[in-house]
């Protein structure tokens, strides 16, 4: 059959139906206005996410990382949460406000964040934080590549620069406490550390990653943020990570994930815009977001405030600022003694950048921070971030990893021949190598979505050029299958490096930097982020391929992956053998206990210090699969992915109010062609209704039922054109 049947044959299909139904004259007739279709999908997802029976939220109103408890990726348990999830909660509620006119849910998301994810004065006593010395922000401790090299010795002889923004912040807000989200929270107190070492209260501030780029989640040792030496070993968990010359003091410590705080600002901007359109106000939440953005500037600075591009020297102020959203900033201090510290991060990943948030915090009068340099610092960051993307854009269009001001985490000399960005060396996979931090496709869509929003709002020429090339690359990598499903890149790999950045010259094309798609998959969260990105880009640029692909991804997910709790797909977890066989490094001679009595000692496995997993409802199924030599499978409902899909539908509804789902009668499998395969699939469906089909296209007589009449009409239509 001719491939032209996609267009010509479809007309014949419609004509052949004239005996029993009214002729269809358009093969792409919209079924209903898109604002209604995609808005309804958003509202359906919102209802499922907020339904208490589905289990997305704790009794305190905190979103879990996932509904499922047996779950290891960046978090090591499904019922922890992250600042990432909290920022998506804000975004979800902002969109709900846009459609419902009710922004109380959005304000509540900020209240929950402030109560549970931003350490209060009880969690970071101002008596300790006020003793912070901006001229001596922290004591240097080298980083190592492998966990077996830890604990790391504190070294007071190494240069540490001056913190130039602390006085700005204390002057603006009248406190020495920091205002940012800690990145991970044990929502149900599963580990048993409790709040401030009480062992029982929930939620509980915890941490995991501490020991270099090769420390995967599977190799971490969970620890409390408030360490009174009550759990763990003689000195709690502190001497697993740093080696002090004296007795480790009882202390608190928190780590911020800058991309999440920036996403919170991003979501709050849209809530503010949409509220104003309806005569409403979210000004209290705007004030919180603006304050958070002010403190987020700590991520602009080298870890120990050393000079950018000259890291052997202590910085004297802003010469220690790279103006990028680095991997973290962190702070801590004494529990029963008055001292404190603050560090930035030397490592910068393109995936954490958010030029949209930088634009908001530097240009919107309502979002300009209170501090003296807040808005101007964010203005510099906006330009520096866009330069960073330009420097890292591969020949194909995908964005490569990042740069560090501290080679190997020890301020070693950047190897000869290494490309640099303002003196910082190119790193293919910044911060983490197991797995490589820029091998996950999700970084592409998370980060470029923010560039797309910036382009949509401002028309920035730099953002447009980045997106033009990136969109061309990714649109060529999306695969729509005959059965209505799809595949997008899952793992990507890199070859070569970018050209050394010259601000005057700008983007060179990076002929020696290449991306390769290693494998494809159906990550619904990433696909939703991709649809969101392409929607914003298409709305501003008019690129029809991007609009169509965004719509097709949204439709494919809705039609093929919806379930009673949201969307999901069966995932193969080839890494789950590490539950049983992954050793967690503990120095010889070090012993301690987890709150439940699990012994921490040399030779322990992941499961040995997380024995409560053996009580999980999915545990026996997973172990049985492993023992049978099979790869365990799961259906997972990650909060961020569910929210991303909901928001992406909302974005499409807003930006394309007149574009509904395309309808091609007879295209039962959704491959945009009507042929004998569709007839066969429809027959299979009639025999077994679990078969996946495009019901709108299969309903040949538009009676809202798929039955033998539709089969007969499709068969008649196909025969008439042969």
From Swiss-Prot:
Region Disordered, annotated ranges: 142-165
Record GO biological process: cellulose catabolic process
GO terms, molecular function: cellulase activity
Start and end residues of each Dockerin domain: 661-722
Annotated EC: 3.2.1.4
Highest taxon of the lineage: Bacteria
Function: Probable endoglucanase involved in the degradation of cellulose or related beta-glucans.
Family according to the record: Belongs to the glycosyl hydrolase 48 (cellulase L) family.
Name used for this protein in its record: Endoglucanase F
Organism: Ruminiclostridium cellulolyticum (strain ATCC 35319 / DSM 5812 / JCM 6584 / H10)
Gene name for this UniProt entry: celCCF
């Amino acid at each position: 059959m001719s491939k032209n049947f996609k267009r010509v044959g479809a007309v014949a299909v419609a004509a052949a139906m004239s005996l029993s139904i009214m002729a269809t004259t358009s093969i792409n007739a919209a079924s209903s206005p898109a604002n209604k279709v995609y808005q309804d999908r958003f509202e359906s997802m919102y209802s499922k996410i907020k339904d208490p029976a589905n289990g997305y939220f704790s009794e305190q109103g905190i979103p879990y990382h996932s509904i499922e408890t047996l779950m290891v990726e960046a978090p090591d348990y499904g019922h922890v949460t992250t600042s990432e999830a909290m920022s998506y909660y804000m975004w979800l509620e902002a969109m709900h406000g846009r459609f419902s006119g009710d922004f109380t849910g959005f304000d509540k998301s900020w209240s929950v964040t402030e109560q549970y994810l931003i350490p209060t004065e009880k969690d970071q006593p101002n008596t300790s934080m006020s003793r912070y010395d901006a001229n001596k922000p922290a004591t240097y401790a080298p980083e190592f590549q492998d966990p077996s090299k830890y604990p790391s010795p504190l070294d007071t002889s190494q240069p540490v620069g001056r913190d130039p923004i602390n006085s700005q912040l204390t002057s603006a807000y009248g406190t020495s406490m920091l205002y940012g989200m800690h990145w991970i929270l044990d929502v149900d107190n599963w580990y048993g550390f409790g709040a401030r070492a009480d062992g029982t209260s929930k939620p509980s501030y915890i941490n995991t990653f501490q020991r270099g780029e090769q420390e995967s989640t599977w190799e971490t040792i969970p620890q409390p943020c408030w360490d009174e030496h009550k759990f763990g070993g003689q000195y709690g968990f502190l001497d697993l990570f740093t080696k002090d010359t004296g007795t480790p003091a009882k202390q608190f410590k928190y780590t911020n994930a800058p991309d999440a705080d920036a996403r919170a600002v991003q979501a709050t901007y849209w809530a503010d815009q949409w509220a104003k359109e309806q005569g409403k106000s979210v000004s209290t939440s705007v004030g919180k977001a603006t304050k958070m953005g002010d403190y987020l500037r700590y991520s602009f600075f080298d870890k120990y405030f050393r000079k950018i591009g000259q890291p052997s020297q202590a910085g004297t102020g802003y010469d220690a600022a790279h103006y990028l959203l680095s991997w973290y900033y962190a702070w801590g201090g004494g529990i029963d003694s008055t001292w404190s510290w603050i560090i930035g991060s030397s490592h910068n990943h393109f995936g954490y950048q958010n030029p949209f948030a930088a634009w908001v915090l530097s240009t919107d009068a309502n979002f300009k921070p209170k501090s003296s340099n807040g808005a101007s610092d964010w203005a510099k960051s906006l330009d520096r971030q866009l330069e960073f993307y330009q420097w890292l854009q591969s020949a194909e269009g995908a964005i490569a990893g990042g740069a560090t001001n501290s080679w190997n985490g020890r301020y070693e000399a950047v190897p000869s021949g290494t490309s640099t960005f303002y003196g910082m060396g190119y790193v293919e996979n910044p911060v983490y190598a197991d797995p490589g931090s820029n091998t996950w496709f999700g970084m592409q869509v998370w980060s470029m979505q923010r560039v797309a929003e910036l382009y949509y709002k401002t028309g920035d020429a730099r953002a447009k050029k980045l997106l033009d090339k990136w969109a061309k690359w990714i649109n060529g990598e999306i695969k729509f299958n005959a059965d209505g499903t799809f595949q997008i890149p899952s793992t990507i790999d890199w070859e070569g490096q970018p050209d050394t950045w010259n601000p005057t010259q700008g983007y060179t094309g990076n002929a020696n930097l290449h991306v390769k798609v290693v494998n494809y998959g159906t990550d619904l969260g990433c696909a939703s982020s991709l649809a969101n990105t392409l929607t914003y880009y298409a709305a501003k640029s008019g690129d029809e391929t991007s609009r169509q692909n965004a719509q097709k991804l949204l439709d494919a997910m809705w039609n093929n992956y919806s379930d009673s709790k949201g969307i999901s797909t069966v995932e193969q977890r080839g890494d789950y053998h590490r539950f049983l066989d992954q050793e967690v490094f503990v120095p010889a001679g070090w012993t301690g206990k987890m709150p439940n009595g699990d012994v921490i000692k040399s030779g322990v496995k992941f499961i040995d210090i997380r024995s409560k997993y053996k009580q999980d409802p999915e545990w026996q199924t997973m172990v049985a699969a492993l023992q049978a030599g099979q790869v365990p499978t799961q259906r997972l409902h990650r909060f961020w992915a569910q929210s991303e899909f909901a928001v992406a539908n909302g974005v499409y509804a807003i930006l394309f109010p007149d574009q509904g789902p395309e309808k091609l009668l007879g295209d039962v499998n959704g491959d945009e062609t009507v042929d004998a395969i569709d007839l066969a699939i429809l027959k299979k469906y009639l025999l077994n209704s679990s078969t996946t089909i495009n019901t709108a296209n299969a309903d040949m007589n538009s009676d809202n039922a798929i039955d033998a009449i539709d089969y007969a009409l499709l068969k008649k239509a196909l025969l008439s054109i042969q």
